[in-house]
Amino acid sequence: MQCPFCNHGELKVIDSRNAPEANAIKRRRECLNCGQRFTTFETVELTLQVLKRDGRYENFQESKLINGLNAASSHTRIGQDQVHAIASNVKSELLGKQNREISTKEIGELVMKYLKKADMIAYIRFACVYRRFKDVGELMEVLLSATPDMEK
């Protein structure tokens, strides 16, 4: 790390504290060259590798998850706060797993679990894209499972 004021590479840590609200460590540093003080926050970066359907791996991107949720929940009662809450819950569950390699199937199933609780229309829209139905029968299975009180 370098001093943001003079770009000198030698720094001294003056104080170090937990910052639980940011899930980080807050450090007060002083440059040994210019004497300026500044604060840094250190956080753990856990990267997830997503196994795509075609066999490629790519880094997990929460923005892609949010875009998919936005598309599924457009014109429903799900607002942006709930979209972000669902994305956060999905990401937390994925980070809680021991394996840092996850499949798109795992992500899709988690999203469907949360959407089913939140809004049935968003759930069905997401299922249509995620599951790539081959015929109407597959769609009907999802519709019937989504509405257990309907007669089959």
Swiss-Prot record:
Biological process according to GO: negative regulation of DNA-templated transcription
The cofactors it requires, by name, are: Zn(2+)
Disulfide bond entries = none
Q: Which GO terms describe its molecular function?
A: ATP binding; DNA binding; zinc ion binding
What are the coiled-coil residue ranges?
A: none
- All copies of domain ATP-cone, residue ranges: 48-138
The record's keywords, sorted A to Z, are: ATP-binding, DNA-binding, Metal-binding, Nucleotide-binding, Repressor, Transcription, Transcription regulation, Zinc, Zinc-finger
Renumbered zinc finger spans (unnamed): 3-34
The domain of life for this entry's organism is Bacteria
Family annotation (InterPro entries): ATP-cone_dom, NrdR-like_N, RNR_NrdR-like
Textual note on the cofactor: Binds 1 zinc ion.
Under Pfam families, the record lists: ATP-cone (PF03477), Zn_ribbon_NrdR (PF22811)
State what this protein does.
Negatively regulates transcription of bacterial ribonucleotide reductase nrd genes and operons by binding to NrdR-boxes.
The text of the family note is: Belongs to the NrdR family.
This protein is called what?
A: Transcriptional repressor NrdR
| Annotated organism of origin | Chlamydia felis (strain Fe/C-56)
